Amino acid sequence: MVRAVVATLLVVLVVASCVSAQLNFSPGWGKRAAAGGEGTGMHPPAGAVVPPPSSLAGESCGTIPVTTVMHIYRLIRAEATRLVQCQDEEYLG
């Protein structure tokens, strides 16, 4: 009887150590819609299609400097490197 309890506890601990999860919460989560069903005005109702602002539509954006794009690329690459290092430390440690 004691061995069965210990074995079950050991299996639960091994499974729990192998499982990882991530929770994401949005700012509008859990809030009820306004009386008109339009939401709070801060966020569109779920499933609603929001057209882009006129300043973003079409060709009015202009060109983006290459230096800006390269800076963003370097930031993303640095963060990806940090994530890989953290994952390696987690798996090895």
Curated annotation (Swiss-Prot):
The modification Tryptophan amide is found at residue 29. Coiled coil: none annotated. The modification Pyrrolidone carboxylic acid is found at residue 22. GO terms for molecular function: hormone activity; pigment binding. This is Red pigment-concentrating hormone. Pfam families: Adipokin_hormo (PF06377). Residues 34-56 are annotated as: Disordered.
